Amino acid sequence: GNQTEITVSFTPAEYDVLTYQGYFHYFDEQAMADPMVVDAGLDGSAKTMVNKFTARAIEELEKATLTAPAAAWSFDAVVDAIAKMNLESEDGLFLLISPADQAAFRKALKDDLKYSEGFVRTGYIGSVCGVPVIVTKAVPANKGYLATKDAVTVFIKKATEVEQDRDPNTRDNKFWIRKVAVVALTDATKAVKIHIGG
């Protein structure tokens, strides 16, 4: 028979279902003068929506309960953050940092990476302890987030929809692109907040 009983628990949390929307408009004359106007507008709207999703994901990572304070960015700071996760396998980890911290991180790692051709040529950080370092403006200065993709989940509630409207008198074309979703921290054990100077 069974020797142990496996139990599962969860903490209920309420989340807001949000609409992420991009909007742009152009006039027929603009599209005639430059056929890329529509493509650029659609691309800009899509990027706006992605940036909003990214900002929400960072807000959710901020709720993580595991923390790894560090005096400064260093190889040791990353090692300590990885240790907080207590993982058997470190596959799938990534580290998000701010562009404001990128220079300090490069300087701190210069002795560890000085023989890496990419670092010597471009200042490329790449990976630290096998963890890819991703620089994003969505992360505030002096903070970092070590995580796996399982930490935050995007629950799509409504597929992408596109609406358009055109005023025939002014030849003004309007586009709205939207997606309805919930962005939530779904596994707090898969994320560590790194506080620099704290």
Language model segments and positions:
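Short charge-dense sequence patches
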Residues: 1-3, 28-32, 109, 125
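Generic structural motif
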Residues: 15-22, 27-31, 52, 100, ...
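Solvent-exposed loop and beta-edge segments used for protein-protein assembly and interaction
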Residues: 16-18, 89, 169
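Helix N-cap / beta->alpha transition motif
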Residues: 27-28, 96-101, 147-148, 187
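Extended, solvent-exposed, turn-rich assembly/linker loops in the middle of proteins
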Residues: 61-131, 136-138
